[in-house]
C-alpha cells in the first residue's frame, strides 16, 4: 500500500469536443434564417478561434450559438476568452476568441495558497501548468478536491482532477 496519495489539478479541454462543437455551430449558422446570408466563417487555430461575420448583431448571435452548443457538449465556457471585436475589410467584423488551456503561474500560486491555508495535512507543488496535491490519506485529498471545486468560480478557469493515486 502506498504511504502517500496524490492527484493533479489541471485546466484543459477536449479538443475533439471543441471541433465537434464548431461543426455544430457552422451547421446551425447555415440553417438559421437570420444568419444564412451573413457569410460567417469560424476558423480554429492552435490557441484561438477567429469568427468573421457581417455585423455586430450577427457576431452576437454566433457567440450565443457557440455558448449554447459548447454547454450541450460539456465544454466549460471558461475556456473561451472573448477579445474585443475589430473591423475587417469589406464591412465585416472579426473577433478573436483565445482558448484557455493550462494553469498560469499566477492562478497556480493562488490555488496553492488557497489549499495550503485551508488544509494543513496536504502538500501542494506547482509543476508547470498543473498543481500536484499530495497527502497521507485519501480523505485529505477528498477534502482538497471539495475545497478546489468550491473555489473554482474565483479562479475563472475550468479545473479537472487527474492522476488520482
From Swiss-Prot:
Q: Which HAMAP family match?
A: YajQ
Q: Name one Pfam family in it.
A: DUF520
What are its GO cellular component terms? cytosol
The name this protein carries in UniProt is: Nucleotide-binding protein Syncc9605_0652
The answer, when asked if Metal-binding is one of the entry's keywords, is: no
Alphabetized PANTHER family for the sequence? UPF0234 PROTEIN YAJQ
Keywords from UniProt, A to Z, are: Nucleotide-binding
Its family?
Answer: Belongs to the YajQ family.
Q: Name one GO molecular function term.
A: nucleotide binding
Amino acid at each position: 500500500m502506498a504511504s502517500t496519495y496524490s492527484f493533479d489539478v489541471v485546466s484543459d479541454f477536449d479538443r475533439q469536443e471543441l471541433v465537434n462543437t464548431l461543426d455544430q455551430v457552422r451547421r446551425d449558422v447555415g440553417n438559421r434564417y437570420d444568419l444564412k446570408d451573413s457569410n460567417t466563417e469560424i476558423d480554429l487555430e492552435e490557441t484561438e478561434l477567429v469568427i468573421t461575420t457581417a455585423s455586430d448583431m450577427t457576431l452576437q448571435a454566433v457567440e450565443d450559438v457557440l455558448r449554447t452548443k459548447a454547454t450541450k457538449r460539456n465544454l466549460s465556457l471558461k475556456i473561451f476568452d472573448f477579445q474585443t471585436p475589430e473591423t475587417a475589410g469589406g464591412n465585416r467584423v472579426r473577433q478573436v476568441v483565445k482558448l484557455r488551456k493550462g494553469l498560469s503561474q499566477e492562478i497556480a500560486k493562488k490555488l496553492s495558497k488557497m489549499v495550503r491555508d485551508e488544509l494543513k495535512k496536504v502538500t501542494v507543488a506547482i509543476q508547470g501548468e498543473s498543481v500536484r496535491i499530495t497527502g497521507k490519506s485519501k480523505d485529505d485529498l477528498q477534502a482538497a478536491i471539495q475545497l478546489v471545486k468550491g473555489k473554482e468560480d474565483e479562479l475563472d478557469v475550468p479545473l479537472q482532477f487527474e492522476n488520482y493515486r
